[in-house]
Amino acid sequence: MNGFVEGGAYSKSANGSVWYPTFFNYNKTTDVMRPSPSNLWLMNDEHPDSINDGWEITGVEDPNSWVDLPASYHNGAGGFNFVDGHSEIKKWLEPSTRVKVKYSQYNGFPAPKSRDLAWVIERSSAKR
């Protein structure tokens, strides 16, 4: 689940997301204004080695490194659904996104100048 969709797990704060306070968090559907519901991803496939909790955290302040990595086991693509209900299969462009599964949990995947990470950041939250 998108780490910015906190769903009331934390106290509602004027400071934004628990993870990145300068970005919006979303506790209910009426909180979704930017990006729009059709551009805010809700759930996706996460890379098996990256799974460490119920959220996929996107490092919106570092466009050169994944915190948690989306999956790429659908022929080099990953599935996303969005707040408005539609879903997309995103074909990954960068080798740094298509990481071989090692069955060993870790986080922090280098992705210098990644077009894939830029795509996910743009659809994860918005600057407050």
Task: Label the model's feature ranges.
Residues 1-128:
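Short, well-structured segments within or immediately adjacent to enzyme catalytic domains
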